[in-house]
Amino acid sequence: MRKLVRMDFFFYGTLLDEDVRRLVLGPEAARLGLVPARLPGYRRVAKGYSSVPLLARRSGASVEGLLACGLDCRQAARLRHYEGRDYRLARCKVRLADGRACAAMVYLGQGRIPLPRGSWRLGEWQRRSKPAFLKLAALWLAAYRQAGYETRGRVRWVKRWAARD
């Protein structure tokens, strides 16, 4: 019998938006366990050339977000496609409201990080950029489905990550 792999992810940017989560993760997004959490040692900044955020290390700072509990391999693979090559997956410790720490997967900027344009705020992004962003994200994810990744199960990397300590 195959072992069902489930992973927890920390969302700090566009995935805080319910419509984006539903687009990326599918209808199952509504059933995700979402818990308020914060990631210490980072701050959320606006990426220099786009409307999406990234995390920059900063001692004493922390980023508020959501811990999404129990994503399956297919959802994790869709997340990987959504995040693209500008981000890398890392395991970090997040803090829950009651002070407990727990491990979560987080997408961090990869390679040389462009100069940040200041803080990134969800409400501002939703007012200014969300409608156009949703259209582009829908096209990006349609390309993922057309490539057959949904049915071929390109999720081995997820199982490798889940097995790491």
Model-found features: residue ranges?
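Glycine-aromatic micro-motifs
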Residues: 2-165
